[in-house]
């Protein structure tokens, strides 16, 4: 029943028909309104009132929800963050001037991955749109499944960053998920062929919002040509993706999706960078979580993360760049050392570092300022922020050109110097834009006086109209000689000159009659008419002219977007180098050595995060690993003693070294690591029905299938989620597998409570035992946090329970049970009379199952350290061939006393 709808409602339904899977924000005067099902959704999600207006197509009352237009920045992010797409349908003309219904149209579609408003994301993170193109290959992978070939691209339209890569080997799926974890896109688009792959979409949805996009975009042979047209190049070879079919498909899909949603040319997206996974250390989602690289495990915030600990950056660009570096440590010593050189110079030259960081404090988010300028969403305040940021560049440039000794800092200085024209842009903004302009660009008050003579005149007319009228009246009295002449105004006739009939003979010839009154005539002159138009419209024209001037300035800035973005990138890099130098000085870090061999040698290593949070000082520890004698470190010791911290700090020091950062140690040499694997902690995956043990085994399988001789593996308490026999068997098999993998095995740190594993040091030549030193003082237990060679024979479980605050009655009962189990172990063991061999009863087997460590009292003898009870130890010392009958009887009484 469209005939009962208003013209505005027809416009709404036309927009909804064009964007059926999108919520519509429909501009109606001072509000954005939504109707029907959209209104119900918006009211629910935004917790606003749902009302009704008019009638829908069926004649029923139409549900309505609306928000004030000026509050869109508050409400829109809430919908986007929940995964909705929102189409903004604006009024395309001034309602006051509209003839009939106001023209309206969708001006942009906001999605999680194409948001440009700063209120929708953090300055510290990129807001990536991810596009995946690919197909199922003909070959089978390791486990018999079909291999997949993938090209993936990441586009941040708020900064202009555009990246692409392609996977062509058998680990495509795992690498795709690793990239997903590292890049953390806000949205991912897939062609129907991949969208229908439930395994792929399921994994993607664990990390991001997944959308299906037009199939023809992902597979078109014209993708390469369209990319070349966009970038204005003749070939994609310079971007490195000319021969990467799926990388090109995914890149064009991402760009086309962004253009479709933004409905404009994305001129600030002016380059595409192709990267390879062989350039960076792989850190999968499990490792990122376990090592807390950028987020902590507790609440997924950045507090107590490595990123937060090292972050002394002063700019948003530096903030984001630091996070990228931490997520992608380098594999090339030649690329790492220039970073270390620059950090060393800035750490040593405290005055230069102080000046740089002081200047950087005035730099705003140039990348996103440029994005808003190009999109036409910038405010005058954004231009002032850009001006202040560009104003810092000469100081940074000149200081570095004068003092920089190492190549990386010199390159930054030369890059900043190559865009000296940017100073002209800052000067243009300084001359044109008020220092403290209003928020809106549509209400005037942002252009300085003196910039535009026309604008100055309009402002003068608007603010001085009364003075001008008075002066005009006096001038006309003198010219005509009519002393009673006056200038008046009414809404019907506008401004007029009024002359009484008595003085009509003195009216000048250029006066034009406008109205005859009973006692007077009203006239106007061309000058008065012109001024009338100016006076009546001066303010309106002034506001319009201001916006026109502002738009012209932004067009000039947009034309220099590439130079501005490259400047922002250099500033971000400099900020990170200065930040890491500051962290070095604040935390007493040292420069690591990077090598191509498999050695890891750390002296006095410290956990960078833990040492910044603990009081009383952090106990440093050494780590020595190589491919000859120390490839596999088996670490034993009680809970809470610091095994996990020690393993994590070793990995974090290696990661920091390959990032190009100084490290918390007195000395560190790291052989390049291609991937860090971790199996630490217990996490149930209840959503998919996986127990702690199942999760552990899945993660372990990933490690064993993918670790290489250049990897570093951290394993903590493997096998604890099942029976002790099963767990021990799995743990031992894992040690043997990693030790024997390839010619030199895989570097690994393995923390365990299975004491029997320490015997592997005698059987496997590259396994070395270490343990955490503990000091006992009566019932007190002191963790010394020091890693020392050799195995421990104690678990101290009951001691740890006491430290944790377990009630003393429970502690006492636990000790009683422990003693009973020890006695049971002796009493249940008997001789097999037929073959003379010992056999264990079921009770003894149960006891052994529970006590792979010997957790007895602190006064055990050296014999007990070998796994013997007091009775067994005493018996071991007895030589029956040398005893008399009476001595044997006395010894039997002694043994009985030992049994209590």
Curated annotation (Swiss-Prot):
Q: Which GO terms describe its molecular function?
A: ATP binding; ATP-dependent DNA damage sensor activity; damaged DNA binding; double-stranded DNA binding; mismatched DNA binding
One GO BP annotation is: mismatch repair
**Classification via Gene3D superfamilies:** 1.10.1420.10, 6.10.140.430, DNA repair protein MutS, domain I (3.40.1170.10), MutS, connector domain (3.30.420.110), P-loop containing nucleotide triphosphate hydrolases (3.40.50.300)
SMART domains, sorted: MUTSac, MUTSd
User: HAMAP family in the record, alphabetically?
Assistant: MutS
**NCBIfam families reported for this sequence:** mutS1, PRK05399.1
- To which protein family does this belong? Belongs to the DNA mismatch repair MutS family.
Q: What is this protein called?
A: DNA mismatch repair protein MutS
């Amino acid at each position: 029943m469209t005939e009962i709808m208003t013209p505005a409602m027809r416009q709404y339904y036309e927009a909804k028909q064009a964007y059926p899977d999108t919520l519509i924000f429909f501009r109606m005067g001072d509000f954005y309104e939504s109707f029907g099902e959209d209104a119900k959704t918006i009211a629910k999600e935004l917790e606003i009132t749902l009302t009704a207006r008019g009638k829908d197509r069926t004649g029923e009352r139409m549900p309505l929800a609306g928000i004030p237009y000026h509050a869109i920045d508050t409400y829109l992010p809430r919908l986007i963050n929940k995964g909705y797409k929102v189409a903004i349908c604006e009024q395309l003309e001034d309602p006051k001037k509209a003839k009939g219904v106001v023209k309206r149209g969708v001006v942009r579609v906001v999605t999680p991955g194409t948001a440009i408003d700063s209120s929708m994301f953090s300055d510290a993170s990129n807001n990536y749109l991810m596009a995946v193109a690919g197909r199922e290959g003909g070959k089978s992978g390791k486990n018999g499944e079909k291999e997949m070939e993938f090209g993936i691209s990441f586009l941040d339209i708020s900064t202009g960053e555009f990246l692409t890569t392609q996977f062509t080997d058998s680990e495509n799926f795992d690498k795709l998920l690793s990239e997903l974890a590292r890049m953390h896109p806000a949205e991912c688009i897939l062609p129907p062929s991949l969208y229908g792959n439930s395994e792929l979409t399921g994994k993607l949805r664990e990390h991001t919002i997944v959308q299906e996009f037009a199939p023809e975009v992902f597979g078109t042979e014209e993708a390469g040509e369209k990319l070349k047209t966009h970038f204005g190049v003749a070939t994609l070879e310079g971007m490195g993706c000319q021969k990467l079919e799926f990388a090109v498909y995914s890149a064009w899909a991402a760009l086309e999706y962004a253009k479709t949603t933004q409905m404009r040319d994305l001129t600030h997206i002016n380059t595409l960078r192709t990267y390879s996974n062989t350039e960076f250390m792989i850190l999968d989602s499990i490792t990122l979580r376990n090592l807390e690289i950028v987020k902590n495990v507790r609440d997924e915030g950045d507090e107590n993360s490595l990123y937060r600990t090292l972050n002394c950056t002063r700019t948003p660009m530096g903030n984001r760049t630091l996070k990228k570096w931490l997520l992608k440590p380098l594999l090339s010593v030649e690329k790492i050392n220039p970073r270390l050189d620059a950090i060393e110079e800035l750490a040593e030259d405290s005055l230069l570092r102080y000046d740089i960081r002081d200047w950087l404090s005035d730099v705003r988010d140039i990348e996103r300022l440029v994005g808003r300028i190009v999109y036409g969403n910038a405010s005058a305040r954004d231009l002032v922020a850009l001006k202040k940021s560009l104003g810092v560049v000469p100081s940074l440039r000149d200081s570095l050109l004068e003092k920089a000794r190492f190549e990386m800092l010199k390159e930054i200085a030369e890059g900043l110097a190559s865009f000296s024209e940017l100073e002209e842009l800052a000067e243009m903004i300084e001359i044109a834009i008020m220092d403290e302009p209003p928020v809106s660009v549509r209400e005037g008050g942002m252009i300085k006086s003196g910039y535009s003579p026309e604008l100055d005149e309009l402002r003068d007319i608007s603010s001085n109209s009364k003075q001008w009228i008075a002066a005009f009246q006096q001038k006309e009295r003198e010219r005509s000689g009519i002393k009673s002449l006056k200038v008046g105004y009414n809404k019907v006739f506008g401004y007029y000159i009024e002359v009484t009939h008595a003085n009509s003979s003195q009216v000048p010839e250029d006066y034009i009659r406008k109205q005859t009154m009973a006692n007077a005539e009203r006239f106007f002159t061309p000058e008065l008419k012109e001024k009338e138009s100016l006076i009546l419209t001066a303010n309106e024209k002034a506001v319009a002219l201001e916006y026109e001037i502002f738009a012209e300035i932004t067009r000039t800035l947009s034309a220099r977007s590439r130079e501005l973005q490259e400047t922002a990138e250099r500033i971000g890099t400099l900020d990170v180098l200065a930040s890491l130098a500051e962290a070095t000085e604040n935390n007493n870090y040292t420069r690591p050595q990077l090598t191509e061999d498999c050695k890891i040698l750390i002296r006095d290593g410290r956990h960078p995060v833990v040492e910044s949070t603990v009081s009383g000082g952090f106990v440093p520890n050494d780590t020595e690993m190589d491919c000859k004698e120390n490839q596999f470190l088996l670490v034993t010791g009680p809970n809470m003693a610091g095994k996990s911290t020690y393993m994590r700090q070793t990995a974090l020091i290696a990661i920091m070294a390959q990032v190009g950062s100084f490290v918390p140690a007195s000395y560190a040499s790291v052989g390049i690591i291609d991937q860090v694997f971790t199996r630490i902690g217990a996490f149930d995956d209840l959503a998919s029905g996986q127990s702690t043990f199942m999760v552990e085994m899945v993660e372990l399988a990933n490690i064993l299938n993918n670790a290489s001789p250049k990897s570093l593996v951290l394993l903590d308490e493997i096998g604890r989620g099942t029976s002790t026999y099963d767990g021990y068997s799995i743990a031992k098999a894992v040690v043997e597998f990693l030790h024997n993998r390839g010619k030199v095995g895989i570097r690994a740190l393995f923390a365990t409570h299975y004491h029997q594993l320490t015997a592997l040091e005698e059987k496997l030549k590259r396994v070395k035992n270490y343990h955490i030193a503990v000091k006992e003082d009566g019932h007190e237990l002191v963790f010394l946090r020091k890693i020392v060679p050799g195995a421990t024979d104690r678990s101290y479980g009951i001691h740890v329970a006491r430290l944790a605050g377990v009630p003393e009655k429970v502690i006492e009962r636990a000790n009683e049970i422990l003693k009973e189990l020890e006695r049971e172990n002796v009493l249940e063991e008997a001789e097999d009379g037929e073959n003379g061999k010992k056999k264990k009863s079921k009770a003894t087997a149960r006891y052994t199952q529970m006590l792979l460590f010997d957790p007895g009292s602190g006064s055990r003898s050296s014999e007990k350290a070998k796994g013997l009870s007091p009775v067994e130890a005493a018996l071991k010392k007895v030589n029956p061939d040398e005893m008399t009958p009476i001595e044997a009887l006395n010894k039997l009484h002694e043994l009985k006393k030992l049994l209590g």
